[in-house]
């Protein structure tokens, strides 16, 4: 209770301010560039990381912070919406997320999603899903950084759920490197606490890039291989927790 009261008092004014600014920017995209809109969202995400007292323990943080002209596909496991907040707070280069279309109907969230040009996928439509995979892949090929939560939805367990077919399709069109990202304890920043407002430790690992050649050599097993790499690191995090 104490934690959420503090978060509401500290975060709500900032989110409301961001909402108003982005509503204006989204209506005048010819005047406000994508990079400028992303900076507004990023500043809000950095503030949310701060007010939730989230301490990110990161392996290979230079991978996401380094300047790079080529596009990438970040492939992450998924426990919490706060993973997107942390990724945006870390990346100066704009990130484009692939998200289920239902999220685009959530107040406040939809405004921020629109500002950072989130690509929405309809999981009930195979045709639309294929179109989204192609669009995301082409944008990565054109030097954009794409973020995919490859399980398709948040894991209800403490393990990584099987990866969906979208991953190899996107990499096929992207023809670029893939960065695997493992999150551990990423539900903690938004966990309800009754009588405390503690620092929340989240463990993150950015893997070394997987080349497009690796995909070509492992097409049939690609989703399984990448899933197992992240699961192995998650198991390591859990053993050390």
Where are the model-predicted features located?
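Short gly/ser/thr-rich secondary-structure transition/capping motifs
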Residues: 52-59, 129-130, 186-189
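Generic preference for hydrophobic
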Residues: 58, 74, 97-98, 204-206
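Anionic-ligand binding region
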Residues: 128, 132-136
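A cross-family acyltransferase "interaction/gating" segment
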Residues: 108-111, 145, 156-221
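Residue-level preference for the first positions of well-ordered beta-strands
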Residues: 71-73, 143-149, 177
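Catalytic core of membrane glycerolipid acyltransferases/transacylases, capturing the structured
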Residues: 18-27, 36-39, 66-126
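Membrane-anchoring hydrophobic helices of lipid-metabolizing enzymes
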Residues: 1-72
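Short glycine-rich anion-binding loops that position phosphate/pyrophosphate groups of nucleotides
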Residues: 78-80, 151-155
């Amino acid at each position: 209770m104490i934690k959420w009261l503090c978060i509401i008092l500290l975060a709500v004014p900032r989110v409301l301010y961001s909402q108003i600014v982005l509503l204006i920017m989204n209506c005048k995209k010819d005047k406000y560039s994508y990079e400028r809109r992303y900076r507004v969202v990023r500043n809000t995400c950095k503030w949310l990381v701060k007010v939730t007292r989230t301490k990110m323990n990161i392996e290979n943080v230079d991978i996401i912070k380094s300047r790079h002209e080529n596009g990438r596909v970040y492939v992450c496991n998924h426990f919490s919406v706060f993973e997107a907040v942390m990724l945006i707070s870390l990346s100066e280069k704009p990130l484009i997320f692939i998200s289920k279309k239902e999220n685009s109907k959530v107040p406040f969230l939809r405004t921020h999603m629109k500002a950072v040009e989130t690509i929405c996928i309809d999981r009930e439509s195979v045709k639309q899903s294929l179109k989204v995979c192609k669009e995301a892949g082409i944008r990565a090929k054109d030097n954009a950084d794409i973020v995919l939560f490859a399980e398709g939805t948040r894991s209800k367990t403490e393990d990584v759920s099987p990866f969906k077919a979208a991953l190899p399709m996107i990499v096929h069109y992207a023809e670029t490197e893939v960065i695997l990202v493992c999150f551990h304890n990423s539900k903690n920043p938004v966990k309800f606490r009754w009588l405390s407002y503690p620092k929340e430790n989240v463990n993150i690992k950015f893997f070394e890039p997987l080349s497009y050649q690796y995909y070509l050599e492992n097409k049939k097993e690609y989703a399984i291989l990448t899933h197992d790499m992240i699961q192995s690191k998650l198991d390591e995090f859990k053993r050390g927790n």
